[in-house]
């Protein structure tokens, strides 16, 4: 199998703290670059866990179409600014950040007070602008998750009326692009490919860590396929016929035949169906007359048993 390597050939951090990493992967067999590129891109864009603001409480406000006295931005603008926060929480439970400020002030992300388990990536992100003589009180809920989670209108009915929910984007990777180039090989050798991937994150994780996490998820996905085992289907036992469930008493046998069968632990027609004529004769004190009596009783309900053990 062809061995390849991955090299990060470029890494940039933007003013908003988003990170861009460019990776060179190769050499690869023809077709493998497309397989790797598509698989990694799918996981990077939708399979990685991230953090996002999921709800905001604003003092004195109970719906998103309101305005706040002394605040330049309306509630929708503030919710959008909170939604766009690049944030990283290491707590699997909901974290709540709080903000209580007086104007005049331009409120930025760094002004929100979180526990030590929450990191605000872009602390200079503007949240709101407050005029002199006014104040603003915010409560911001942060959760971890995967992918995109729209606002659950049904859940809104059971939450506090002043807790404004936000559709949450948990995806830490903002963009993934890849290109495939053919590499030069010796004459007569099979063609080789080289994969170049550009990964852009929101800064809550690095492109290197994002690639590593995506690769680990793919390994976990494909690993079980390396140990495929055949599972034998267990045939379902057929349901016993109604006749087979008839108790021995209902065959109206003679007392002698009935008692002999009972002593042989025969309690129903189902038990008798495991016997042949020869087997019946081997029951203690069970003669041919009793055996013939049993055969006739079974035939009356449409059941026959073989003459000998080897009969088919």
From Swiss-Prot:
Please report the name of this protein according to its UniProt entry.
Answer: DNA-directed RNA polymerase subunit alpha
What is the superkingdom listed in this entry's lineage? Bacteria
Please tell me one Gene Ontology term that the record gives under cellular component.
cytoplasm
Quick one: where's region Alpha N-terminal domain (alpha-NTD)?
Answer: 1-229
The Gene Ontology biological process annotation of the record reads:
DNA-templated transcription
Q: Which UniProt keywords apply?
A: DNA-directed RNA polymerase, Nucleotidyltransferase, Transcription, Transferase
Q: Which reaction does it catalyse?
A: RNA(n) + a ribonucleoside 5'-triphosphate = RNA(n+1) + diphosphate
Belongs to which family?
Answer: Belongs to the RNA polymerase alpha chain family.
UniProt source species: Prochlorococcus marinus subsp. pastoris (strain CCMP1986 / NIES-2087 / MED4)
Query: What are the GO MF terms of this UniProt record?
Result: DNA binding; DNA-directed RNA polymerase activity; protein dimerization activity
Domain comment, in the record's words? Answer: The N-terminal domain is essential for RNAP assembly and basal transcription, whereas the C-terminal domain is involved in interaction with transcriptional regulators and with upstream promoter elements.
Which Pfam families does the protein's record reference?
RNA_pol_A_bac, RNA_pol_A_CTD, RNA_pol_L
| Annotated EC | 2.7.7.6
Summarizing the function annotation, the protein's role is: DNA-dependent RNA polymerase catalyzes the transcription of DNA into RNA using the four ribonucleoside triphosphates as substrates.
Taxonomic lineage from the root: Bacteria, Bacillati, Cyanobacteriota, Cyanophyceae, Synechococcales
Quaternary structure annotation from Swiss-Prot or TrEMBL: In cyanobacteria the RNAP catalytic core is composed of 2 alpha, 1 beta, 1 beta', 1 gamma and 1 omega subunit. When a sigma factor is associated with the core the holoenzyme is formed, which can initiate transcription.
